[in-house]
């Protein structure tokens, strides 16, 4: 785990780079952001440390929702109204596209059924080190997988610009790294080089694959990764 000094140093670098890369008026294309929100009951999680209510997610979203890029949100019809209201607070409703999805668990129903079956397998339960981890919840794993489904769906619907970035709805958990929410108040432009970019917390090859699978150590953050 990084120490506080490492985090602060990284944060200072981020702010400096952001100021250099946010070159409005250049030929760089605007980045389209894609996210999703579905209440799968994490507010009732047995582990209090992992518990995240819908209200908490909306508060976390409100911090970064001021970013001025076009934002595509996959969510249910009820949550859509709250999300639109939050973006409207920053005058960004016209740059917000809601894709109402009220049949989340029917989109890949066969896959969800297989995940649920695996989650009940005793060998699976005995193997996992943390029995109450979110990743043991088939609905959580299904929703995680749907990030890629939604990115592809947005592409097929013609909603994306040339550059697209996924942002987790609850990104940064309310200010763990980016303590000043005003740091999100900018239009993000960046000249991606045509590759998929994924930010890793550590070298994934530095640990044994089976160990990572059992302990579910975080390696890839579900935020700010993009492609062009």
Enumerate the language-model features and the residues they cover:
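Short loop/turn segments at strand-loop or loop-helix junctions that form parts
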Residues: 32-41, 100-104, 167-169, 201
């Amino acid at each position: 785990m990084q120490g506080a000094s490492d985090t602060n140093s990284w944060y200072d670098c981020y702010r400096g780079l952001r100021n250099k890369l946010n070159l409005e008026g250049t030929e760089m294309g605007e980045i389209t952001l894609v996210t999703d929100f579905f209440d799968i009951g994490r507010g009732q999680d047995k582990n209090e440390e992992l518990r995240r209510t819908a209200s908490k997610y909306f508060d976390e979203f409100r911090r970064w929702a001021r970013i001025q890029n076009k934002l595509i949100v996959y969510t249910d019809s009820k949550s859509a109204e709250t999300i639109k209201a939050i973006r409207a607070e920053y005058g960004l409703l016209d740059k917000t596209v809601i894709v109402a999805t009220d049949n989340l668990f029917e989109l890949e129903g066969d896959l969800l059924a297989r995940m649920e079956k695996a989650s009940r397998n005793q060998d699976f339960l005995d193997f996992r080190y943390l029995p109450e981890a979110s990743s043991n919840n088939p609905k959580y794993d299904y929703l995680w997988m749907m990030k890629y489904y939604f990115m592809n769906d947005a592409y097929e619907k013609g909603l994306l610009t040339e550059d697209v970035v996924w942002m987790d709805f609850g990104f940064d958990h309310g200010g763990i790294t980016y303590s000043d929410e005003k740091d999100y108040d900018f239009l993000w432009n960046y000249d991606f080089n045509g590759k998929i970019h994924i930010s890793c917390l550590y070298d994934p090859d530095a640990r044994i694959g089976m160990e990572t699978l059992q302990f579910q150590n975080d390696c890839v953050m579900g935020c700010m990764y993009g492609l062009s």
